[in-house]
A protein has these predicted regions:
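Charged/polar, solvent-exposed surface patches and flexible loops
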Residues: 28, 35, 39, 79, ...
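Proline/serine/threonine-rich intrinsically disordered activation/regulatory regions
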Residues: 1-75, 169-233
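Beta-strand-rich binding-surface signature
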Residues: 27, 34, 47-52, 58-61, ...
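Generic signal for short, ordered secondary-structure residues
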Residues: 12, 60, 64, 81, ...
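Chromatin/DNA-recognition segments of nuclear transcriptional regulators
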Residues: 95-182
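Homeobox/homeodomain signature
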Residues: 23-27, 88, 107, 124
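Short, amphipathic alpha-helical interface elements at domain boundaries
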Residues: 61-97
Length: 233
């Protein structure tokens, strides 16, 4: 059973299968990005410091090795999310306000545990700037690669806009195509909570369908949710 995706978990199986070809291609491109976000730090050459992924938008997202740790910039996180909203059928129309919301969420990721706080024009920021990973060399956090809950950030940004629309306010993104047009918002609980429950239900169903294995044998494949983590405090 395929894991539920943040972009389509609110749709029925029939609705997911009936998505237009363009929407299916776009969601496959999101899967390609997610694979990069999982696998980028693997199998580097001894003298390698950066690995890039070309988004369909024409922008690059970079995994950067610095001080023996893998990093991603806030700018690249926003690029990932902007692309995901576009692929979802809800492109960004107010970039400034959209970015402000993402960077506000990123404040939950703390220096030292989730990110490196870099002083203005540090050697690291200079490297990132020269490689188009950041737009400015002002003091900022650069995030540890696996500390960033990408799905959670997507859902929280989507929920903010859906709430704005429900209250008659201007959203930072606008639904123009599927699956966004068919996405039904239930405001009784957060989107992330709804996704987590759906994933847990599917995981339980998956486990119940698996044959029993003798001790010492593994029931592969093991299902793992990349962003199944509590909100950082």
């Amino acid at each position: 059973m395929a894991p539920q995706k943040p972009e389509t978990f609110m749709l029925s199986t029939e609705a997911q299968q009936a998505l237009p070809h363009d929407a299916q291609v776009a969601l496959q491109q999101v899967d390609n990005l997610k694979y990069f976000l999982i696998s980028a730090p693997v199998d580097w050459q001894p003298d390698q410091y950066i690995r890039r992924f070309l988004l369909p938008t024409g922008e690059y997202v970079s995994c950067v090795l610095w001080n023996n740790l893998f990093h991603i910039s806030g700018t690249d996180i926003v690029r990932c999310l902007s692309f995901r909203f576009q692929a979802f059928g809800r492109p960004v129309k107010n970039s400034k306000k959209f970015e402000e919301g993402i960077f506000s969420d990123l404040r939950n990721l703390k220096s030292g545990t989730d990110a490196s706080l870099e002083e203005p024009k540090s050697a690291f920021l200079d490297f990132l700037y020269k490689n188009n990973c950041i737009r400015t060399q002002k003091k900022q956090k650069v995030f540890y690669w696996y500390s960033v809950p990408h799905d959670r950030l997507f859902l929280d940004a989507l929920e903010r806009d859906l709430k704005r629309e429900k209250m008659g306010q201007e959203a930072t993104t606008v639904a123009v195509s599927e699956p966004a047009l068919s996405f039904q918002y239930d405001s009784s609980q957060s989107l992330y909570e709804q996704l987590t429950k759906t994933q847990q239900a599917n995981s339980s169903s998956f486990s119940a369908q698996q044959p029993a294995f003798p001790p010492g044998q593994s029931s592969s494949p093991v299902m793992r949710n990349m962003d199944a983590m509590p909100r950082p405090i």
